[in-house]
Amino acid sequence: MVINYKKLNPNGFYLLKYLNDETIRFIILYGGSSSGKSYSVAQTILIQTLQDGENTLVMRKVGASILKTIYEDYKVAAIGLGISHLFKFQQNTIKCLVNGAKIDFSGLDDPEKIKGISNYKRVQLEEWSEFEHPDFKQLRKRLRGKKGQQIICTFNPISESHWIKKEFIDKDKWHDVPMTVTIAGKELPEELTKVKSVRKNAPRQILNLRTKQIEEQAPNTVIIQSTYLNNFWVVGSPDGTYGFYDEQCVADFEYDRVHDPDYY
């Protein structure tokens, strides 16, 4: 499948890279408003669904907000990629007409969805910071039974006391990784893939229950941090040939940078 790279932001290139990396269990996208997190996830999961025929579950804490938020992102993303004719958009489900795979949408207020997530290859947690820590622990334990299953989380800046900071980030060690993406054997130019940071957690020593030997597990989590400066539909593409320069949006962010740096 060929996708025009001019349809994607830097977040999208990293998502395509790590959605195809079976050593990565958790893909975390972190950044403020207008950084293109949710839309990039929608784009790349649609692409992956066409390519691998696997099912995805998209969740928010409360289901009532889904249709007007992340579900709409998927519809707009499919149209933007020129692939909407390859999907059937139903209430709470998007079905791929090419291979029968589904993208289901649900709130955590539907407890039955948590019990039956083992048949999904991917689970997306939109607005991750709205979920409680016990919610996340249940989800990560129940997503099992298939090789390469992944949880993709998007969230905005949080307080130092939030459980994501205390229980997920602070309990691991992190290191920066090169901001490089190779597609079809060709490394993309740096200006197309530059974000604020890309970090992975440290390898872990894990007991193999079959061999009773301690083995090293490769890093299983990647955190991609971006800002509005990495959204080509806010600041325009590096070469000026695609995307959109939103003068009013940029002016608003610049005002905050000068007058309200803590909020910025």
What are these regions (language model features)?
Residues 1-264:
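Phosphate/NTP-binding elements of NTP-utilizing enzymes
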